[in-house]
Every structure is written in C-alpha cells, then in structure tokens.
Amino acid sequence: MGKAKRCRKVIHGRNQSAVINPNGQYPIYGSGGIMGYADDYLCPEHCTIVGRKGTINNPILVETKFWNVDTAFGLHPNETIDYLYFHYFCKGFDFTKLDKSTTLPSLTKTSLEQIDIPLPPLNEQKLIVQKIKDIFTQLDKITAEL
C-alpha cells in the first residue's frame, strides 16, 4: 500500500456576500455546515470541507456542488482515491496537529497538501468503505434497541 500527498485538490473558499441568494441552487458551507444558498459554486461534488479558521477538526462531507466560505477549505479527491474513503480518512485524522497558530485554530493549504494518506488500490478502498458502512449500520441497530 502506498501513501499519497497529491491525491486531492485543496480549494480555497471565498466571501459569499456577492453570490448569496436565498433561492440559490447551491448551498453555501462553512466549517459548521450550511450558511445559505448561492447561484454559483466553487467546489464540485464529493468534497470534504475542513475549517481554515476556528473549527478545524470537524470534516463535513458534501455530495453536491457548493460554495465554501473563506474560513473553510474544500478538499476534492482525484481519481486515485474514493471520495468516501477520503472522507473517512479525514474524519479520523487529527487536523489540530497541523495548527501552528497561537490563538484561533488555523490550517493552511500547504499543511493540508502535506498530509500522507494511506492509499491502497481503489478496489480495496471501496471494500474498506463498505466495511465502515456495515459497522455504522450495526451501530445504528444497537442504538435503536437501547
């Protein structure tokens, strides 16, 4: 199994004030979730959002096109990595290890690009994702029975 640094694109967010539209087609995301809607998007489908400032350790999976605000990065995996495998990796990664700030937790594009991601073949990634989904299904059943 290899490791990869360049298996995702880091997409800078931008201020949403010029594109915000309550009837817009695309959600506007910050690191805490949906903040509104827009008529334009910055990120394609199947991205994971990671906060740039503030909430940096709560990755959010977005399966539609969206606009990310200037305090959030959109991480888009390339064709060598399954987007759900990538998201589960992000959920388990401690982004606070990359924080170099002294006050407000912060991440940089450079630090995100330097993360080594274990990269098994694509078919194995899909098997890992299915196993994770199966475990979550079992957990949901157990929780419902409590």
Predicted regions and their residues:
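A common structural junction motif
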Residues: 94-97, 136-137
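A short beta-sheet element
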Residues: 30-91, 100-112
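Feature detects amphipathic, helix-rich regulatory segments
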Residues: 3, 12, 19-25, 43, ...
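Non-catalytic DNA-recognition/assembly elements of restriction-modification systems
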Residues: 1-30, 118-146
